[in-house]
Amino acid sequence: MSKKNQQISPVLDNIVTSLLQSLSDSDESVRSTVVNSLYEIGFRQPNFVLQVACDYINKNQKIDQTHRVKILNSILQILEQTRNQLTDALSLNLIAMSISEMTRDKEVVPDWQQVASSLLVSLGLRYPSQIMDELLKRFEPGTLPHYFVMKTLGDFISSNPIPTVPKIREILSRILPVLGTIKHDNFKWVFAAALGHFADAIVQYVANIDTAPDKSLTLYSFSSEFYPALELMFSKWLGTNHEKVRLVTIEAVGSICSILSVEQLESQIQKLVVGVLSMLKKEKDLLPVTHSLCCILEVCVKNDLKLQVNELLIPIMTTLHPLVCIVPDYSNPASTKTYNEVLRCFEVIGRGYSDVLISFLNQRLENRDLRSRAGSLSIIRHIVTRLDVELADKKPLILSAIKPLIQTEPSLFIKKYLAQIIIAMAPYGYLEMEGGLTLLEFIVKGSSWYQDSEIGKAQPTQPPKKIENPDLHVTDSELRLICDNILNLITTTMPQLESILWPYLFEFILPEQYTAAIPVVTKSLTYIALSKKSVDSDDYYIDFDKEINLPKPTQIIARYFVLLTAPLRRNQLGIRILENMKAIGPILHPSICDMWDVTLPKLISYLEDHTDIETWNKNQWEELVLRLLSETIKNAADDEWTVALGNSMSEQIDHYKKDPILKRSLYKQMGLIMQKCSHKEFVKSKIEVMFTSVDYTNSLENEGCAIGLGYCGASHFDIVLEKINFYIKNSMVKKSGFFGKKGPKGIKNCILLSLGYSATYAQSALFSSRVEVHVIQPIKPSILQLKKVPKKLSSIKMIDLIGKALHPNKASTFIFKQRDELMKLLISYMSTPPPSTNNQVKIDGTNACSTLVNLEPMISLELEVQIINLSLSFFNQQVSPANATNTDSDEYKEVNSLITSVNNLLSTILYNQTTIACLNRLIGYLDPLSRSKDAHIRERSLFCILYLVKKFIEYSTDSDSMPTDKLFDSIGTTLSVLIPRCTDPEINVRRYAVESIQLILYIGFMLKNATPDNRRVKPSEVLHPLTSIRDSITTTEVNEQFSLVFEISVIISKMISLEEIPKFLEGSIKGLQDLQAFSTNGSCIIINGLIKTRGEELIEYVPILVKGLLTAMEGITSETTMNGTLVSLRSLANHHLIPVLSVLLEYPMPHSVHVIKSFQIIAKDKNLISPTLIHLMDLLNNKPVYEEKPDPKNKNRIIPQPFAIALAATCSLGEIFQLTEVEEVVKYFYHQLISTLVLRAGTCNNSLPCLIEVASTNPKAKASAISLIPSQQMLVTFRQFFKCTKEEETLLAEIESKGSFSQLETPFYHQGIIEILSVVSSHHPDLIQGIFQYLLPYQRSNHLEHRIVTISVTTELINHCKDKELIQRLINTLLNSLVDPLVKLISLKGLSNIVSAGVEQTNRYAPTVIDALSTSIDDQDETMAMECMLGLSKIFEVADEGRVAPILVNICNRIRPAFEKPNDSIRAASFQLFGSLWRFGSGSACDPFYEQIHSSLPSLIMHLNDDVQSVKNSCKKTLFQLSTLMRSQDAMDYFNNKSKGFVGDNDQPNYEEFLLDFSKLLIINYPERVNYFVMTVIEFFKSTWVNLRGNAATFIGFILGNLTEDKRTQTNINSTILTKSLVGLLAEKSPAVRKKAAESLGLLHHY
C-alpha cells in the first residue's frame, strides 16, 4: 500500500470536527443537514474528511452510541462514492477502526455494529485480501468469533465471490471445529446465514468460472467441508425454539444441497426432505422452507435420484398440496411468492416424476373439499402449460382426471378453475383427444349459466345475502364471462381447433339448457363460417342428413326467429343471430340467402343504432322480425317447407316454458306461418297445439296466442272461430254462463282476446256477418258480471277490438245493434270500486268507449252524460308524491294515459257532433272542474277545453260540408269560464286559457266569414297579438301579467258583439270570487284607470289615499293584485310626488315590505325617479341628520344621535337601487350619489343606534323599541348602489376585496373612503371634477365628519386628476387643511399624491410639498413619520435632481437607523424611501451616494428575506432601483434579468439562489469590499430576528464557499474568524439557524 501524507488545514479540520460533533443535535432536520454537509465536503475531500472522522471516533471513545452510529453512517455514505480515491494508509485506518467498532462490544448491538460491518464489506470491494485477513485474525481456530465477524464474512463473500471463494476452505477449517459448540441462537443464525451465502457464492463463482482466478474449482470442490456442517445444522439447529434460526438454517440447507456430491446427497436426501416437510407443517413463514425444498428437488431431478426420492414424493406432495389450496393474498408479496414457490415445487416434481404427480392429483381431485379440488386444478393448470413435453404421454390421464368434475361438478368456484384449465389445455392438443369435446361442452354450459331478467314476470327484490366464504364465492355472471371469453379465444386464436368446432357447435343451438349461450356460440359459428366462406372451403356446406346429431335447417331457423324477438339480451343476442343467419344462409336454404343478404345487414344496422333499453321499441322490432319471416316463407315458396318450419317451431314450444316473452313471440310467428300455409289440417292441428300449450295464467302468453290466432284468422277465420267456440262450450260444466264453468284457470282471458284479435285481422265483410250471432251472442252472458280485473281487461280489449273492426271506414253500412249495451257494460266495469277495478281498467274502458262512440248511430244525451261524468271524475286521479316529478315511473305514465283517454273520448263525441252546441255543452261539463281548488284538476280541465277547441277547428275545416252554425252562440259565457284562468297560479293553466280564448274568438270570426271556397279563414288582425300574449303569459312577473290580461280584455271587447258583453261580464264577475287569489286582478285595473284620469284633483286626499292603499296591501295575498295596487299608487305619485314621498318617509323604520315596494314602484317611473333621488339627497346632505348627545358609556363624550328621517332616506335610496330599471338615471346622478354616500359614511360613523318605537297590539302594554345601526344601513345602500350601476363584478368586487366597506365602520373610515374613491376615480375619471365641486362646500362644514370626508376624497382625486387648474385647487385645499391632527395626517399623505400628476406638476409643487413632508419625517408619531417617508419616496421617484441632490446624504443618514426598527411598516417605508433616491445617484452626488449604497447593501440583502412581506417587497424594489448605480454591468444585468425575480411586481426571487449569485457578483466585481461586507453581515449573527441570523449564516457560507485561495488573499478575509463564527452558530437555540450554519459549513470544503 502506498502512503500519502495529507496537509492538515486547521480551518477545515475545525469545520469537519464541528460538524461531526453536531451529528448529535437534538433536531432531526439539523442532523440530516449535517450529514449532507459532511457528504459534500467528503465527496470533494474524501481522504481528509474520512481521516478526521476516523480520528474523531478513535479519540472520543466515550461519545454515545447513537452519535457513533451517525458518524459511521456518514463515513459509509462518503465511502460508497469515493472508495477508489482513498489512500492505502487511510483505508487501513478505516479497516482497523471498523474492525474495532464492530468488535469492541462483545454483546450484539445491531445498529452500531451493522454499520461497521457494512463499512468492511464496502472496503472489501477494493481490498478483499486485507479484509479477509483482518476478519480471519479475529477468528482464531477453535474459538467462536464475534457475531458480526461471522456476519461480515457471509455478507463479504456474497457480495464479492470471485476473489473470495478460494478462501472458503480456510474459513470452513475454522468454522467446522466450533460449529458443534455453538449454544446461542443468534450465533446459530449468523453461522447458518454465512454458510448459505458461501454456498450461493460457490454456485455464482462456478457460473462465472471464466473470470475466476482458480479455474480448477468445481461445484463439488467444497462438498466434503460443507457435508458435516449440513449434518450438524440439520440435526441440531432445526430443533431450536428460535423461529429465525430455523428458517435461515433450512434456507441454508437448500443452498448447500446445490454443492454436495451425488453420493452425499443420496445419503442425506431422505432425512433432509423429512425435515423440510416437518417444518412446512410448523412454520408460519413458509417462503424460506418452500424455497429450500425447491432447491433440494431441483438437485434431485438434476442428478436423477429417482430411487431415493420416489418414496418421498407422496409425503412431499401431501404436505405441499394444502399450501396451494389457499388463494394467495396478491396484495402481500410474501404470500404470492410462497404460492408461486409451491407451484414451482410441483413443476419440478412433474419434470422428473410425472407419473407419480398425475396419480397424486387424480386422487386429490376426488376430494370433496372445494379448496382441495381447486388447489389440484391450479397445479394441473400450472404444469400443463410448462411441461408439455414431459406430459406428452400423460395427457389422456389428465383428461380422464378432470372429466368427472366437468360432468358433475356443481360448485361455480370449481367450475371457474375448470374453465381456466380448459383454456390452458386448448393450445396443447387436449381438445382434439378422445373425450375432448366434453371440455368444449363444459365451456358452452358455462356460458349458459344465465337466467334472463326479462321473462314476463316481475321478480321480487331479494335482499343481498351474506357470503360466508367470500374467497370461495363465484357468481354466475363471473363464470359466464370467463366461459364467453374462453370460447371466443379458442375460436379466434386457435385455428387448429376449427375442425373440432365446426359443425359441432350447431348441436348447442337447439337444446333449451344452452339458450343463454347462443350469442357466443353463434358468434363463433359466424367467425368460422365466414373464414371457410372466404376461402371456399369444401367443408363449409353441411349434409344435415348425414350429420344426424345436428339440428335440421328448419329447426335452426325456427329457433333463431323466436330468439330474434329479444335482441337486446346478453351479448347482443339479436346482432349475433342475424350475423350467423347471414353467414350460414346458403347452408340453410338456397332460395332465401339472396333476400337475407339484402335484409339482414339493415336489421343489424337497426340494432346497432338502437341500443338503449329505455327507448327500445319492442313492437316495431317484432314487426320487422315478422316481416322477415313472411319474406323468408315467400322466398322459400314451398308449402311443405313452410309446414316443416311450423312443425319445428311447435316442437320448440317447451323450450320457452320459463320465458313467456319468447313464447309470446313464438305464438305470433306460428300464427303467421299458418296464415301463409294452405294445409287446413296443419292449421287445425297447430291451433290445437297453441291452445293446449299456452299458460293461461300468464298475460303475455295469452296475448301471444290470441294475436297468433288473429294472424291465422286472416286466412282461416271460420276455422279459428270454430275452435274458439269449441273451447267455449267444452270448458263449461254448468249452462248458466261461461265464466261460471270450470276449465283451465285463465283460459277465459285467452278466449276473449282471441275473439278480439280474430276480429282485428279477419276480412271485414266476413266478420260483420258473423259478429252479432257467432261472436257476441255466445260470449255475452259470461261478460256481464265480471269482478276480477284481468277478466275485465280481457273483455274490454275484446270489445275495443270488435269496435275497431266495425268502424265505418271498414264496415260502412253496418249498424252494431248491441253497441249501447256494451257501452253501459264498460261504464259498469269502470264504476265498481277497487279492487274490482284499477287505472288500467279505466284507461282501456275509456278508450273502448271512444271506439264505440264512433259507431253509428250517435249515442243518446243520457248515455253521453253518464260516460262523461264518469270519465271526468278520473281528472281527480293524482300521482303519489314520490313519483310526481318522475315522468319515467309506471304510475306517472298510467295516470297520464288515463287523462289522455278522457280527452280522446270527449274529442270523439265532438267529432261525431261538430256543432257549437256540443262544444258549449262539453265546456259546460268542464266548467266546475276549471274552478277547482286543486291545481292538477284545473290544469287538466283547461287542457281538455283547449284540446276540444282545437279539435273543433280541425273537424270543422276538414269536413266535407260547411259548418251548420253561422255564429258562436253564447261566446261571452264560454269566454268568461276562461278569464279567471288567465292569471291562474299555474303556468300551464294560464297558457291553455289564453290559447283557448284566442281559438274561441277565431271560431266566432271563422263562423261568420267562412265560405265554401275559403273554409280555413285567415284570422282577424285583432287576434294576432294573442299569439305573443300566449307565449308571454307564462311569465311570473306580475306587471307583465296585468298588461297582458289588459290587452286580452281590449281584444275581447273588439271581437264580441254588444249583446254578448253582458253575458261576458256576468260570467267574469264570478272570477272575482275565484278560489285562487291570482285570479282576482280586475278590481286593480279599474282602480288604476280611475287614478290615471282623475288623480290631479286628489291633492287633499293624498295622505288618506296613500295610507289607505298601504293598509289595503296588508290584506292582499295575491302578488298580481298587489302589483295592481302598487301601480295605482304610482299613478297618484305622477300627480303629487313630494307629498306621496313625505307620507312614505314618515312610516316607521325598518320599512315594511309594502313601503319598500311603494318606493320601488315610484322609482320605476322614468318621470319620477330623478326628482325622487334629488329630494332624498337633499334630505341627507343639507338637512339636519343628527343631534349631538352624551355617550351613554361616557357622559363626558359627545356622539351623534341620528334623526329617523336621515335613516329613512338612506334606506329608501338602497331600496330604489335594488331596481334594474333605474340604472341609467343612477348613472346620470353618479357623482352626486357617490358624494352623498361618502358624506353619509362620515356622519353615521360612531353614531348611536336609532331607536324606533313599535306599537304593541295590546293597548295596555307599553310600546317596544327596536335598535337600528345607521352605519349598517349605509353599507347596504352603498353596496346596492354599485349593483344598480352594474359594477358589481368590477368596482364592488374590487372594493370588497380591499375590505374598504369594513373600514367604514371603524375609526379609520377615512381610509375606506379613500380606497373607494380610488376605485371610482379609476373607472370614472370624467367624474372627478364633479365630485370635487359637489364636496367642496363641505370642506368648511360644521360637521368634522364632513371635513374629514372632503379632505380624504381630495387626497385621492389628486391621484387621478389630469386637469392642471383642478390640481392646483386640490393642492391648495390640502395645504389649507394642515390643522386638525387627523385632517393633517390625511392632507400630508395626499400631498405626496402629486406624483400621479406627472413630472411637470410634481416639480412645480415639489418645493412646497417636500418642505411640508420633511418637517415631519422625524415626528414622534410613527404613523406620521412613516407617511412622510412614503410620501417623500413617491416625490423622489419623480422630482428633478437639482431639488434633491443637496439633501441626499442627509436624508440617507436620517433614514438608515430605521432599517432595523421593530415596526414593520417603518422598516418597509425606510427601505422604500432609500430606493427612491436612486434617481439622484448619478449626478453631482454620485460618489457620496455610491458609498451610501454599499453601506446599506448588507441590510438590504438581509432584509430581502425579512419575516414581513412588505419589507421583502421594499428591499426587492430598492435593489432593482439601485442596480444601475452599482457601477457593475454584471450587477445591473443580474437585477434586470426577469428570471431572477426582481423585475415584476408579482415575482419573488429565490432567496438562497440570489445569495449564491450575489456572493459571486460581490467577489468578482467588488473584491475590495468583500471584507467589509462579510464583517457587516456577521453582525446579523446577533440579530433578534431568527430569520436574519439564518440569512447571515447562509450568505457568509456562500461568500466563503465561492472565494478561491487567490481571492481570499486579495480580499484580506480572515477565514478563521468567520468559520469560528459559523461554527458558533451550530450552538444556536434555533434549529433553523443551526441548519443554515451546517449548510454553509458544507460549502467550505476547500479551506
Curated annotation (Swiss-Prot):
Keywords annotated in UniProt: Lysosome, Membrane, Repeat
SUPFAM superfamilies for the chain: ARM repeat
Write one Pfam family the protein is assigned to.
HEAT_MROH2B_1st
Q: Where are the HEAT repeats?
A: 9-47, 65-103, 224-262, 351-389, 597-635, 968-1006, 1131-1168, 1364-1400, 1403-1441, 1490-1528, 1612-1647
Q: What is any one GO biological process for this UniProt entry?
A: exocytosis
Any single GO CC term annotated in Swiss-Prot or TrEMBL for this entry: WASH complex
Record's Gene3D superfamilies? Leucine-rich Repeat Variant
Q: How does it assemble?
A: Homooligomer.
Q: What does this protein do?
A: Lysosome fission factor.
* Family named by the database record: Belongs to the MROH1 family.
Q: What is this protein called?
A: Maestro heat-like repeat-containing protein family member 1
